[in-house]
């Protein structure tokens, strides 16, 4: 079966196939199942974009959606994630979409369950569908990855988006740079080079900003965030020095006037809401791949 757990498990060919399917969906192609097929969304962390994007994608494909609430489930009675998935599998669910606060929650599950797991984000680890929608957005803009210079800016240590994107974009031929406060650098992420933000601003093709993840920090104070914006955020002054034709990206939710000046969120360079739109098409493509017998997706097996 075709789990989607991390970007490292996808070859360049597989990435290209998923992006091609996503582009087809973006251009109006329809694909709907004619048989009743249940898919469950299990979100153990809060989500707006990923959760609803998956649900829209599922419904566009004609799938029947089961939205799981941990607070109202037997998880509150101590049921394990494995038993929860096996329960859903037993009652006829054909795939599960999971977001979980634990890094690599899927390691012990992937060989024990008989339905595809689509990782919607694991702790500070991986976020493959966010990466794929970012790749689609970049491809739409530049038509290529080879030779592009991309800055990933902000809370690199705690960002699953940074980890997934840096690895995939490097594989596809882009050059990755990081800019981050010293305490938020991730020395384990070896797919890019750290440089000062102000050096990168006029050089890069893509300015990919990361959310300050205050829920993963001990404190979140207004004065600290103001200082962050001035030192590490995309201010109006920095945007004015950006390279001609370069774009701004952000996985959202956006902390306005922290990672990016509020007036830049929907400026001409910004592709933030385009990323959200592309999320639906990418997740349709990922679901097609996971359910080939139902949706006519890719029939080769991805070994994980």
Curated annotation (Swiss-Prot):
Catalysed reaction, written as an equation: carbamoyl phosphate + L-aspartate = N-carbamoyl-L-aspartate + phosphate + H(+)
Family matches, as PROSITE patterns: CARBAMOYLTRANSFERASE
Enzyme Commission (EC) number: 2.1.3.2
The organism's place on the tree of life at top rank: Bacteria
GO molecular function, one term: aspartate carbamoyltransferase activity
Binding site for L-aspartate: 77, 160, 211
Keywords assigned: Pyrimidine biosynthesis, Transferase
Pfam families: OTCace (PF00185), OTCace_N (PF02729)
Pathway, per record: Pyrimidine metabolism; UMP biosynthesis via de novo pathway; (S)-dihydroorotate from bicarbonate: step 2/3
Function according to Swiss-Prot or TrEMBL: Catalyzes the condensation of carbamoyl phosphate and aspartate to form carbamoyl aspartate and inorganic phosphate, the committed step in the de novo pyrimidine nucleotide biosynthesis pathway.
Membership in a protein family: Belongs to the aspartate/ornithine carbamoyltransferase superfamily. ATCase family.
Subunit comment: Heterododecamer (2C3:3R2) of six catalytic PyrB chains organized as two trimers (C3), and six regulatory PyrI chains organized as three dimers (R2).
Protein name per its UniProtKB record: Aspartate carbamoyltransferase catalytic subunit
Taxonomic lineage of the native organism: Bacteria, Bacillati, Bacillota, Bacilli, Bacillales
Gene: pyrB
């Amino acid at each position: 079966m075709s789990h989607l757990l991390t970007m490292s498990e996808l070859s360049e060919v597989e990435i290209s196939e998923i992006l091609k399917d996503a582009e087809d969906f973006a251009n109006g192609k329809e694909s709907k199942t004619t048989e009743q097929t249940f898919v469950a969304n299990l979100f153990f962390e809060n989500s707006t974009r990923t959760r609803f994007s998956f649900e829209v994608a599922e419904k566009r494909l004609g799938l029947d959606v089961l939205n799981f609430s941990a607070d109202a489930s037997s998880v509150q009675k101590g049921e394990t994630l494995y038993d929860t998935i096996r329960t859903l599998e037993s009652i006829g669910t054909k795939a599960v979409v999971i977001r979980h606060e634990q890094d690599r929650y899927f390691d012990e599950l992937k060989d024990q369950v008989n339905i595809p797991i689509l990782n919607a984000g694991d702790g500070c680890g991986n976020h493959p569908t966010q990466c794929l929608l970012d790749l689609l957005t970049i491809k739409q803009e530049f038509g290529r990855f080879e030779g592009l210079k991309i800055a990933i800016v902000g809370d690199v240590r705690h960002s699953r988006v940074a980890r997934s994107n840096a690895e995939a974009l490097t594989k596809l031929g882009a050059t990755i740079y990081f800019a981050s406060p010293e305490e938020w650098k991730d020395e384990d992420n070896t797919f890019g080079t750290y440089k000062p933000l102000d050096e990168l601003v006029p050089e890069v093709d893509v300015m990919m900003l990361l959310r300050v993840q205050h829920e993963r920090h001990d404190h979140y104070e207004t004065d600290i965030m103001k200082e962050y914006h001035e030192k590490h955020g995309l201010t109006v002054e920095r945007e004015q020095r950006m390279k001609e034709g370069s774009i701004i990206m952000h996985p959202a939710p956006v902390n306005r006037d922290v990672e990016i000046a509020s007036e830049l969120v929907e400026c001409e360079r910004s592709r933030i809401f385009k990323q959200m739109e592309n999320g639906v098409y990418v997740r349709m493509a990922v679901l097609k791949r996971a359910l080939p017998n139902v949706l006519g997706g890719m029939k080769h097996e991805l070994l994980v």
